[in-house]
Amino acid sequence: MSFSERLLAAWYQGHPALALLRPLEALYRRVANGRRADFLSGRKPAYRAPLPVLVVGNITVGGTGKTPMILWMIEHCRARGLRVGVISRGYGARPPTTPWRVRAEQDAAEAGDEPLMIVRRSGVPLMIDPDRPRALQALLAEEQLDLVLCDDGLQHYRLARDLELVLIDAARGLGNGRCLPAGPLREPAERLESVDALLYNGADEDPDGGYAFRLQPTALINLQSGERRPLEHFPAGQEVHALAGIGNPQRFFRTLEALHWRAIPHAFPDHATYTAAELAFSPPLPLLMTEKDAVKCRAFAAADWWYLAVDAVPSPAFVAWFDARLEHLLAR
């Protein structure tokens, strides 16, 4: 287990040694609260776009299902006839310059794994830049849009926003409830009181003050050929190597278990890069991975490498709330 994995386990499962980090946590909280106050008070300016901006983000470190939820929002808005764009930091990307327009034919090293996954799945106009206002301005210079989704960026207060949606893993919650480095929170838990909606990944029903959504496996996609097969392509009891380089790899492994496959887990750090030699696992079995990992492995994939396609399925109550908010924002 790597240091980052041990730290995540301590944050979410508890460890007495974390008490030693509380002085640093207190400093982190003061800085985070002060920075937000600077923008809310107007002491520091925020860029206000000429169209609605919806931020989809996390308050915790670790995966929450954000990318599938963004893909759902893209398709849902398009079904209403809306022109949607996306901006992202492009974590881990090394583009020739910024801002950088992500296109499907690029590779993950250039575009970032999550932005490339979004573009390949949806074809949405997407611009990456650590400077979110600059990314948005560049996107608007190229596209006529009705609204923009900001992938992450909850803490990027230089970008004014019209709606804040925060995703939380229902099983892990807020961990020990403490801020970095003593816990997994990027901002104090009180920050959740000011967001527009909380979405709980994996909740069985809408919790008090929030909405449930789940990730629904839909198909197996072959990395080499692009062939789409039903989940029944792997029968119950099928043994596979399972690769997950995401913020919460155990959720992926649990999904495979729920599908009655016998997975040999191989967890890697979030946004990890791979080589064919690293993934030559023994014994020789089909390799099953996340879609996010697949965008980094397609160039050297073997014939029996597959990814599990999943779709976000939000609760009907959230869909109704989201539609009402869209109508309000677009009428202004």
UniProtKB/Swiss-Prot annotation:
Secretion signal, residue range per the UniProt entry: none
Transmembrane segments: none
GO molecular function, one term: tetraacyldisaccharide 4'-kinase activity
Pathway annotation: Glycolipid biosynthesis; lipid IV(A) biosynthesis; lipid IV(A) from (3R)-3-hydroxytetradecanoyl-[acyl-carrier-protein] and UDP-N-acetyl-alpha-D-glucosamine: step 6/6
GO biological process, one term: lipopolysaccharide core region biosynthetic process
Binding site for ATP: T60, V61, G62, G63, T64, G65, K66, T67
SUPFAM superfamilies named among the record's database cross-references: P-loop containing nucleoside triphosphate hydrolases
Keywords annotated in UniProt: ATP-binding, Kinase, Lipid A biosynthesis, Lipid biosynthesis, Lipid metabolism, Nucleotide-binding, Transferase
Coiled coil: none
The EC number(s) this enzyme carries: 2.7.1.130
Catalytic activity: a lipid A disaccharide + ATP = a lipid IVA + ADP + H(+)
GO cellular component, one term: plasma membrane
Record-linked InterPro entries: LpxK (IPR003758), P-loop_NTPase (IPR027417)
Primary role: Transfers the gamma-phosphate of ATP to the 4'-position of a tetraacyldisaccharide 1-phosphate intermediate (termed DS-1-P) to form tetraacyldisaccharide 1,4'-bis-phosphate (lipid IVA).
Family statement: Belongs to the LpxK family.
This protein's name: Tetraacyldisaccharide 4'-kinase
